[in-house]
Amino acid sequence: MDILTERGQKSLEYERKMLERIRSTMCDKHKTNSQIVETDKNMDAKVDGMVVTNGELSGVFESKCRDLSLMELRRYGSWLVTFDKIMDGKRLSEMLRVPYLGFLYLIKDKVVMYWKITDKHGNFLFDFDVRNTRTQKTINGGSVVRTNAYLPFKEGSELL
């Protein structure tokens, strides 16, 4: 699996930093009884984790790290996410009756952005483009043509 390589482990390190930041912001600063629960990184789970508040599931999420600054992401205008992942999160949102969230760690600025992608019924909360594009296949390189979603920058927020 790609996560077991040197690049995969570095990406996992960044993701753990991001999730710790989310934990401290959501739980400590806002005084909520929320927890971030990760899925097994050695498996290809349909989502990267769940948010649990007061013992109840309150969200599912996709999390990614990108070697970008906030300004670079703003210039791109959107966050590219594999469309299959968006649809998997949407289906889980529908089935579990919780929102689907996206967390993006911008490595260069150490900034966490987030998007509330669906409501608790699995309805998309904003429009986004879907296109077939050639992208990097894995953290370790290669290329592949996939159907990708482009989540608009303006629909995301910086986690403060």
Annotate each language-model stretch with its function.
Residues 34-40, 102-110:
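Acidic carboxylate-rich catalytic motifs and surrounding loops in phosphoryl-/glycosyl-chemistry enzymes
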Residues 84-104, 113-119:
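Acidic, metal/cofactor-coordinating or nucleic-acid-engaging core segments within structured domains
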Residues 2, 6, 24, 52-55, ...:
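Non-catalytic C-terminal interaction segments of nucleic acid-processing enzymes
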Residues 18, 22, 49-72:
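Conserved catalytic cores of phosphodiester-cleaving nucleases, focusing on short active-site segments
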Residues 1-41:
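Acidic-basic catalytic patches of nuclease active cores, encompassing PD-(D/E)XK
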Residues 24-32, 91-100, 123:
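Structural alpha-beta junctions
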Residues 45:
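Beta-rich catalytic cores
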Residues 66-89:
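Mg2+/Mn2+-dependent nuclease catalytic core
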